[in-house]
């Protein structure tokens, strides 16, 4: 069995997690109390979903997941919510005081009191697996817990489970919408360890997803629930081939192999199509070619970043539903002929495709229409550097005046860590620049950085 353990850290991680597990349960016909009525056996008794759920003796299905937060309110919502019986109480770990938007509190003072408990629980889940494949880590880098405790946990996971792959789903600060003043600090400090300790990191940003909800679903004032349900569809599409059977299954380690050309260049853009409301869906025939084109639209990207400003290094297209390989090949062929979608000259093929026959499930009363087929694209594009340069610029403005730095130093950080993290990100921006540069003559000096 190739199990995956999900780790949800901080408010963003937990709320995205709630949306994901709600969707997984619907997809597999698992009730909120973890029972799976035998008449609803998905896929004729195929147990592929055991990659995400473990079955107890009593026939209850328990998510292989841990929820961690430094303060109790968000986790208490899980403890009292619809799915309270789904999780073992030990899987929900909460502290008493929060990280107060401070990376140093999440990483040093308060985080380190709880991290051993988390690792203990993760170890229990890991011992319950026959062939642990890797970890899916959900967090945001703008706050204190997601960034600080998130980095700390990733560092410790690297020590304890060196070879296991770690996929990050990371919410980055948006260009216009900000939830805290010190976001740039937390993001830079946290990305510093994401660079080292995740194998693939998928960037999400609230503003981009707000825009998709407004534009494609005509929701005037999207809530976090709207956003998270959209994100959960992306994550469900990525993990569908671990949980169902299909024609072209894609493993977690396969993402890594196909998307990451150099170890540091592992920050991905994601997009999903069709994002369409029920009213419109009746009037549209969403062919494979249409949804594929739509996935490449800059407006479909779930991070504010324009792929036309950079070049693609690799793409992973995960189709689900009524899709056959012939259609996929035709659609990809069309994309390759488009001049607007540019690939780097050293990566001529650039496409990895997966097909899964399970059509996308929608949450009842949700915003998305039930469709026959959908595609999720994860792409590695040099334009991701935009996201980092934006944060770096804001970081520099604040750090030049050493604004707010005393809060971090007071929690046991050293100023040197700021400049070290900032230099690391400057190097990352440069790496992206070099990777996108034309020509094959500068390949020899690539060696110093790795």
Swiss-Prot record:
- Keyword Nucleotide-binding tagged: yes
Per its UniProt record, the required cofactor names are: Mg(2+)
* GO cellular component terms, A-Z: cytoplasm; microtubule
Q: Name one GO molecular function term.
A: metal ion binding
What residue spans carry the Acidic residues bias annotation?
Answer: 431-450
**UniProt xrefs under CDD domains:** alpha_tubulin
**Binding of Mg(2+): at which residues?**
71
**Catalyzes what?**
GTP + H2O = GDP + phosphate + H(+)
Major localisation: cytoplasm
Biological process per Gene Ontology, one example term = microtubule-based process
Alphabetically ordered keywords of this record:
Acetylation, Cytoplasm, Cytoskeleton, GTP-binding, Hydrolase, Magnesium, Metal-binding, Microtubule, Nucleotide-binding, Phosphoprotein
> By its UniProt entry, which SUPFAM superfamilies does this protein fall under?
Tubulin C-terminal domain-like, Tubulin nucleotide-binding domain-like
Q: How is it modified after translation?
A: Undergoes a tyrosination/detyrosination cycle, the cyclic removal and re-addition of a C-terminal tyrosine residue by the enzymes tubulin tyrosine carboxypeptidase (TTCP) and tubulin tyrosine ligase (TTL), respectively.
Q: Where is the active site?
A: 254
What else the UniProt entry mentions is: There are six genes coding for alpha-tubulin. The sequences coded by genes 2 and 4 are identical.
Role: Tubulin is the major constituent of microtubules, a cylinder consisting of laterally associated linear protofilaments composed of alpha- and beta-tubulin heterodimers. Microtubules grow by the addition of GTP-tubulin dimers to the microtubule end, where a stabilizing cap forms. Below the cap, tubulin dimers are in GDP-bound state, owing to GTPase activity of alpha-tubulin.
Provide the assembly information. Answer: Dimer of alpha and beta chains. A typical microtubule is a hollow water-filled tube with an outer diameter of 25 nm and an inner diameter of 15 nM. Alpha-beta heterodimers associate head-to-tail to form protofilaments running lengthwise along the microtubule wall with the beta-tubulin subunit facing the microtubule plus end conferring a structural polarity. Microtubules usually have 13 protofilaments but different protofilament numbers can be found in some organisms and specialized cells.
- Any idea what this protein is called? Tubulin alpha-2 chain
Which organism is this entry from?
Arabidopsis thaliana
Q: Which gene encodes it?
A: TUBA2
